[in-house]
Swiss-Prot record:
Task of the protein: Inhibits with low potency Kv1.2/KCNA2 and Kv1.3/KCNA3 voltage-gated potassium channels.
Biological source species: Cyriopagopus hainanus
Span of the signal peptide: 1-40
Molecular function via GO: potassium channel regulator activity; toxin activity
Domain notes: The presence of a 'disulfide through disulfide knot' structurally defines this protein as a knottin.
GO cellular component, one term: extracellular region
Localization annotation: Secreted
Family: Belongs to the hainantoxin family. 17 subfamily.
Protein name per the record: Hainantoxin-XVII.3
UniProt keyword annotations, A-Z: Disulfide bond, Ion channel impairing toxin, Knottin, Potassium channel impairing toxin, Secreted, Signal, Toxin, Voltage-gated potassium channel impairing toxin
Length: 98
């Protein structure tokens, strides 16, 4: 009787391996979906980091004190070098002009 009860609770190594693989696969999908959702909610996050880095760099401070045409102008209160800051209904504001 005890051998029947013990055999019911034993699991084959294949089933354990499949459960671990499934868990790791689902974990990867969850992390990837969080990344994609974050990128969708905050588009251009990498551009912002590059812009902040350039603004702090003393060599580029004069060159990057204003936004060039077609660059974003609504971040960090950056003014346009030439032209004006245009904000469409959807999307980021950008510098427009010569």
């Amino acid at each position: 009787m005890t051998t029947v009860g013990v055999s019911l609770f034993r699991r084959s190594p294949e089933k354990i391996t499949m459960k671990i693989a499934t868990f790791l696969g689902l974990s990867f999908l969850l992390i990837a979906s969080y990344f994609l959702i974050c990128e969708a909610q905050h588009p251009g996050f990498q551009e912002l980091l590059i812009l902040e880095e350039n603004m702090r760099d003393p060599e580029n401070s004069k060159e990057r004190s204003c936004a060039k045409p077609r660059e974003n102008c609504n971040r960090m209160n950056i003014l346009c070098c030439r032209g004006e800051c245009v904000c469409p209904t959807f999307g980021d504001c950008f510098c427009y002009g010569d």
